Amino acid sequence: MEICWGPYSHLISLLLILLFHSEAACRPSGKRPCKMQAFRIWDTNQKTFYLRNNQLIAGYLQGPNIKLEEKIDMVPIDLHSVFLGIHGGKLCLSCAKSGDDIKLQLEEVNITDLSKNKEEDKRFTFIRSEKGPTTSFESAACPGWFLCTTLEADRPVSLTNTPEEPLIVTKFYFQEDQ
């Protein structure tokens, strides 16, 4: 499958496959089709995500509770932008604005129906930034707001505009689910 078009397409394709193997199925131009992939995700304090009362929670799951772990479904839009969801892409993470209040929501939307080119879908778009082995996710609709957890376990996954605050975790590990 050719990833890019143009005189340097083979070099760019090779670099993308080597550097971004999980996103190699998507053309960098943002044109579809991009395949959805499921990932295990955990914060730098080893908290995983699970669903409680229709809210995404970060906590330490052990024993029989391990089966509650939510996998994050990701659809690459372009080299750094992604849509994120859970439950097979049927519940999508979005950035909701209400006055000065900005919060993370789960919306019943099929992740594969979203489009980078639709303004109304911008709230579902997250900019993925890698720094070493960790990744952060910034809302495209609310620049400066990052997906986060708190140091305390069993608290909601949310958004913050103070990513350097000591009680907030904005860096995540993730690996493709087998």
Swiss-Prot record:
Keyword Transcription regulation: no
Signal peptide (UniProt feature, chain positions): 1-26
Membrane-spanning segments: none
Gene Ontology CC terms: centrosome; cytosol; extracellular region; extracellular space; nucleoplasm; vesicle
GO biological processes: immune response; inflammatory response; insulin secretion; lipid metabolic process; negative regulation of heterotypic cell-cell adhesion; negative regulation of interleukin-1-mediated signaling pathway; response to glucocorticoid
GO molecular function terms noted in the UniProt entry: cytokine activity; interleukin-1 type I receptor antagonist activity; interleukin-1 type II receptor antagonist activity; interleukin-1, type I receptor binding; interleukin-1, type II receptor binding
Glycan attachment positions: 110
S-S pairs: 92-142
Keywords: Cytoplasm, Disulfide bond, Glycoprotein, Secreted, Signal
SUPFAM superfamilies per record: Cytokine
One Pfam family linked to the record: IL1
Reported consequences of knocking out the gene: Deficient mice still possess other negative regulators of IL1 activity and adapt to excessive IL1 via shedding of IL1R1.
Domain of life: Eukaryota
Gene3D superfamilies per the UniProt record, alphabetical: 2.80.10.50
Xref: InterPro entries: IL-1_CS (IPR020877), IL-1_fam (IPR000975), IL-1RA/IL-36 (IPR003297), IL1/FGF (IPR008996)
Family from the record: Belongs to the IL-1 family.
Annotated function: Anti-inflammatory antagonist of interleukin-1 family of proinflammatory cytokines such as interleukin-1beta/IL1B and interleukin-1alpha/IL1A. Protects from immune dysregulation and uncontrolled systemic inflammation triggered by IL1 for a range of innate stimulatory agents such as pathogens.
Name this protein carries in UniProt: Interleukin-1 receptor antagonist protein
